[in-house]
A protein has these predicted regions:
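Catalytic core of pol beta-like nucleotidyltransferases
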Residues: 2-45, 53-59, 69-139
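Short beta-strand->loop micro-motif that forms the acidic, two-metal-ion catalytic signature
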Residues: 63-67
Length: 139
């Protein structure tokens, strides 16, 4: 069990995820599918955070997504972030990826930095390397 799922019960996360608009879920799921196909072995976590994860955003709010990759590689990070463009455009939402290496993620955890605490508190883990299975909700 990840540190995030230990703090936020899965049922609560899944319920919040299902309350996203259908185009938001479709954009996220398409993005996850592209990440899995192109970078699956390098992705450790994908976490929705921010106002949409808290269900407090409005129609203009972006989808803040943290992607944790297995190494500190700027080219890989850029490629992972760039994959958000197509699903964003196709589904009329803005996916705002934040790509961290696992080491960077652990440093934020270790020092209890504010962004990590907010992600831990409100984040919805869409994908963990433990399961490699994103949440699926499109009916």
């Amino acid at each position: 069990m990840s540190a995030l799922s230990a703090r936020v019960p899965l049922a609560n996360s899944q319920e919040r995820y299902l309350q996203l608009r259908i185009n938001e879920r479709r954009a996220l799921e398409e993005y996850l599918a592209q990440l899995r196909a192109k970078f699956g072995g390098h992705i450790q976590h994908v976490i929705l955070y921010g106002s949409r994860a808290r269900l407090s955003g409005d129609q203009e709010s972006d989808l803040d997504v943290l992607i944790v990759i297995d190494r500190d590689d700027q080219q890989l990070a850029n490629e992972v972030a760039d994959e958000a463009f197509g699903p964003s455009l196709q589904h009329g939402v803005v996916i705002s990826p934040l790509v961290w290496s696992a080491e960077h993620f652990q440093a934020h955890r270790r020092f209890g930095l504010l962004i990590y605490r907010n992600i831990e508190k409100d984040g919805i883990e869409l994908w963990s390397d433990k399961t490699k299975l994103p949440l699926s909700s499109i009916g």
